[in-house]
């Protein structure tokens, strides 16, 4: 297993100690702290786990797949060995898998099919501040299972921005907080035009960013439809050295993987 240092690393002994004593934990950690990938791996050899699986809940398919791939690389393995993932229409787990990264719908179905959650020792709810009905339902069902059937089941709720103190009181759980990584950020406001479509405004903003800043450009858009419209417009306006790539959960795995690979020398990227 490769040794990587993240801001969360210093807190991992306390995470393990807390779960040795309590069945629930609220963990606050800002983006970049490493909580998504380091907490499940740190718990793999906990005595209370007893060889059972850890379920890591992610709200998006792209995040689920990426988290599993990162943890597998850290272990020097392929996805589907110690760490795997299950998302809609895609299953990368095996009999060896100890950490399963799943999306919210998968967890709900698991709870419905097997209320005892046999063979599962912990459920980690990641990015819980991204409140979804499926995530809230999953936590409610897991709490019910823990209270009625499985008092040995561990539940970890992790968030970057949620009110951790209030959530800890609700769950009757200890609360731990981690530091994050800070990066210098400059905020510029691009003037909007009410008489211009969103796609045209985004195109102008991207062109300005490419002209005035080095490096790649990451554009957040409301959904797949907007991504496709901006993609079509930018293909006709950026130069040949700039690659424009979409990124959303409906893309095939190979296309999503392209975004996560380094760009060729001398080329820039716009990721939508």
In which residue ranges do the predicted regions lie?
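P-loop NTPase motor module signature
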Residues: 1-272
